[in-house]
Amino acid sequence: MQKIVIVANGAPYGSESLFNSLRLAIALREQESNLDLRLFLMSDAVTAGLRGQKPGEGYNIQQMLEILTAQNVPVKLCKTCTDGRGISTLPLIDGVEIGTLVELAQWTLSADKVLTF
């Protein structure tokens, strides 16, 4: 089984970096169901994990994350990044968890590929 880690840094809206990382993650799962895929959000991307955001038009990051978590893709938010933004205690999208750099390091060491957005 191939192991891929996607690390995303961009804000959920205003930049398409996170959007494109999620598009790729969903496409990878559609192409290969026997894939160990993991998603780690850092920097401004951690705000994507907050429940109840209502974008005006276009894509919906919460829906994209829910698609991935429904497929048992682990989605973690950098604890240092959430602490720095004061959002660590706010409600998260179901299936999204706070993670640590140690976890990301472990994921990276066991991965076949690490993709960064």
UniProtKB/Swiss-Prot annotation:
Which InterPro entries does the record cross-reference, listed alphabetically? DsrEFH-like (IPR027396), Sulphur_relay_DsrE/F-like (IPR003787)
Q: Which GO terms describe its cellular component?
A: cytosol; protein-containing complex
Tell me which stretches of the chain form a coiled coil: none
GO MF annotation: an example: identical protein binding
Similarity remark: To M.jannaschii MJ0989.
Quaternary structure, per UniProt, is: Homohexamer. The hexamer is formed by a dimer of trimers.
Q: What is this protein called?
A: Protein YchN
Q: Which organism is it from?
A: Escherichia coli (strain K12)
